[in-house]
Amino acid sequence: MIDEALFDAEEKMEKAVAVARDDLSTIRTGRANPGMFSRITIDYYGAATLITQLASINVPEARLVVIKPYEANQLRAIETAIRNSDLGVNPTNDGALIRVAVPQLTEERRRELVKQAKHKGEEAKVSVRNIRRKAMEELHRIRKEGEAGEDEVGRAEKDLDKTTHQYVTQIDELVKHKEGELLEV
């Protein structure tokens, strides 16, 4: 019962870190990155579909992304979706593919993005702590119902705290890495 609660908590914490990693990857760093477009969707025959499923995305140069739709009739829709996104880029359509030049970030914009990265990191840490809280409640329930002894639950709580600290540290490292990327000129 205790092992099950700890395993479940660790699995959920792992997912929270993965979500944080994905969220941070969508923040533009001033360098071309296919991940920038991972959350942009277009209306594809009535269904919201990710651009990554409708086109190949390549980075031939440090500040250039080339998007080649699998279907030529989707060029205009993809271009419009990118233009309307919050990426702050201006795509150009040459009839066969879309080129997106990634502009240099201003110092002000870098600071803004660092704040955004820290906020996303904080949200992820709150998520991990909530998972810990729920697991602690489960451990207290196990103790109360007599399914495990006081010592067993105490050890499990220490293990849970150690695991929580490990995942919070991972999130801090992800944010620190992203901050370094953003502030690098």
From Swiss-Prot:
Pfam family membership, one: RRF
Keyword Protein biosynthesis: yes
Record keywords: Cytoplasm, Protein biosynthesis
Protein biosynthesis among keywords: yes
UniProt cross-references to InterPro entries, sorted A to Z: Ribosome_recyc_fac, Ribosome_recyc_fac_dom, RRF_sf
GO terms (BP aspect): translational termination
Main location: cytoplasm
One term under GO cellular component: cytoplasm
Record-stated family: Belongs to the RRF family.
Function: Responsible for the release of ribosomes from messenger RNA at the termination of protein biosynthesis. May increase the efficiency of translation by recycling ribosomes from one round of translation to another.
Protein name from the UniProt record: Ribosome-recycling factor
Organism: Mycobacterium bovis (strain BCG / Pasteur 1173P2)
High-level lineage: Bacteria, Bacillati, Actinomycetota, Actinomycetes, Mycobacteriales
